[in-house]
Swiss-Prot record:
Belongs to the Golgi pH regulator (TC 1.A.38) family. InterPro entries: ABA_GPCR_dom, Golgi_pH-regulator_cons_dom, GPHR/GTG. GO terms for molecular function: voltage-gated monoatomic anion channel activity. It is a multi-pass membrane protein. Voltage-gated channel that enables the transfer of monoatomic anions such as iodide, chloride, bromide and fluoride which may function in counter-ion conductance and participates in Golgi acidification. Plays a role in lymphocyte development, probably by acting as a RABL3 effector in hematopoietic cells. It holds the Pfam family ABA_GPCR. It comes from Mus musculus. GO terms for cellular component: Golgi cisterna membrane; Golgi membrane; Golgi-associated vesicle membrane; monoatomic ion channel complex. This is Golgi pH regulator. Homotrimer. Interacts with RABL3; the interaction stabilizes GPR89.
Length: 455
């Protein structure tokens, strides 16, 4: 009876998650498109529902909600479904919609979709060869084979985003990195833009006058037809007329310059607005957050470097370790185990909420940046694939943030994976991403003033 009640709770929560994913799809991703493929919408919503259910099961594990056997069953069921979606269903439909957009392959789209899926499976399976991600005793058809490979892709994605975010967040929030932009700088750049536009108009007038002169002399009517005529009209000019090709090249160069000047002007206006915003109370608050994240970024890079150099992975969750250090330093009586469980629950909850929110915001921006009416179905399926892999790998990494007694069922469900490898791999990719982001932002910040203030 308890199993039925527990299952009804899980099914109800999954329906709610599915509904939220459906609304997000309709209200955010596809609100500007008339053509909707319901199979894409269902796949996206189901992926979102089962991804959120994994985080729900982590919270239930900490709180002791549901029977232990029920939680284990739903862990297994949820993991099997999400892997079925990520490895079989989503890649197949991505290939199907890609082939459907190619007219030559439209009649044989099912065959070519299967070929694309088999190609994906080959490279997906070969992905596990270079990495020590499995215990040697696992069979080729075991569920651990799929989890391990999905985990590598997801952890790599998480580390790249985390490394860039750890550097970009303080760079964005802190007023220290803002360039000093004045009204004089903006006016000077606008003057250059107006001068460039005047030059473009002047040269286009010269081209129009030259074409009119050629027409009046009968050059247009008498010029040879065909390919040779086209080449001659471009490369040769009538006697007494302007060289239209040369003027057109100058116009193209000036138009490209005008586009750059326009973008630089808009950037200066945005920077000036940020300077004004930084003087407000909310701006000062975000400036403080920027300093906090700067410290966190330096600490994270330092710890990642130490972990890589010493080849170590923490055995104790960060909350318990931090409380133990504080208690030993202050020399006070404190129930470390009791409070570490409650604080870990709050920390895990914050990580889960911020992960879901941050990923949805990123997915929305990414979708609007690259989607079109023809590619939108493929893009949504790619986002569903990224989302599912991201959440599966989050479970792999969030395990270390939990006290040891709560890690047991996750370890049992995920199998005998090499968890230490994933944490070391995350540190390596995070460090590379963070250092690359620092170098990129440094060069961009150093070059920007020179570019804007050039005469």
């Amino acid at each position: 009876m308890s199993f039925l009640i527990d299952s009804s709770i899980m099914i109800t929560s999954q329906i709610l998650f599915f509904g939220f994913g459906w609304l997000f799809f309709m209200r955010q991703l596809f609100k500007d498109y008339e053509v909707r493929q319901y199979v894409v919408q269902v796949i996206f919503s189901v992926t979102f529902a089962f991804s959120c259910t994994m985080f729900e099961l982590i919270i239930f594990e900490i709180l002791g909600v549901l029977n232990s056997s029920s939680r284990y069953f739903h862990w297994k069921l949820n993991l099997c479904v999400i892997l079925l979606i990520l490895v079989f269903m989503v890649p197949f439909y991505i290939g199907y919609f890609i082939v459907s957009n190619i007219q030559l392959l439209h009649k044989q789209r099912l065959l070519f979709s299967c070929l694309l899926w088999l190609t994906f499976m080959y490279f997906f399976w070969k992905l596990g060869d270079p990495f020590p991600i499995l215990s040697p005793k696992h069979g080729i058809l075991s569920i651990e084979q799929l989890i391990s490979r999905v985990g590598v892709i997801g952890v790599t994605l998480m580390a790249l985003l985390s490394g860039f975010g750890a550097v970009n967040c303080p760079y964005t929030y802190m007023s220290y990195f803002l360039r000093n932009v004045t009204d004089t700088d903006i006016l000077a750049l606008e003057r250059r833009l107006l001068q460039t536009m005047d030059m473009i108009i002047s040269k286009k007038k010269r081209m129009a006058v030259a074409r009119r002169t050629m027409f009046q002399r009968g050059d247009v009517q008498n010029k040879p037809s065909g390919l040779w005529g086209m080449l001659k009209s471009v490369t040769a000019s009538a006697p007494g007329s302007e060289n239209l090709t040369l003027i057109q090249q100058e116009v193209d160069a000036l138009e490209e310059l005008s586009r750059q000047l326009f973008l630089e002007t808009a950037d200066l206006y945005a920077t000036k607005e940020r300077i004004e915003y930084s003087k407000t109370f909310k701006g000062k608050y975000f400036n403080f957050l920027g300093y906090f994240f700067s410290i966190y970024c330096v600490w994270k890079i330092f710890m990642a470097t130490i972990n890589i150099v010493l080849d170590r992975v923490g055995k104790t969750d960060p909350v318990t370790r931090g409380i133990e250090i504080t208690v030993n330093y202050l020399g006070i009586q404190f129930d470390v185990k009791f409070w570490s469980q409650h604080i870990s629950f709050i920390l895990v909850g914050i990580i889960i909420v911020t992960s879901i929110r941050g990923l949805l915001i990123t997915l929305t921006k990414f979708f609007y940046a690259i989607s079109s009416s023809k590619s939108s179905n493929v893009i949504v399926l790619l986002l569903a694939q990224i989302m599912g892999m991201y959440f599966v790998s989050s479970v792999l990494l969030i395990r270390m943030s939990m006290p040891p007694e709560y890690r047991t069922i996750i370890t049992e469900v995920l199998g005998e994976l090499q968890f230490n490898f994933y944490h070391r791999w995350f540190d390596v990719i995070f460090l590379v991403s963070a250092l690359s982001s620092i170098l990129f932002l440094y060069l961009a910040h150093k070059q920007a003033p020179e570019k804007h203030m050039a005469p």
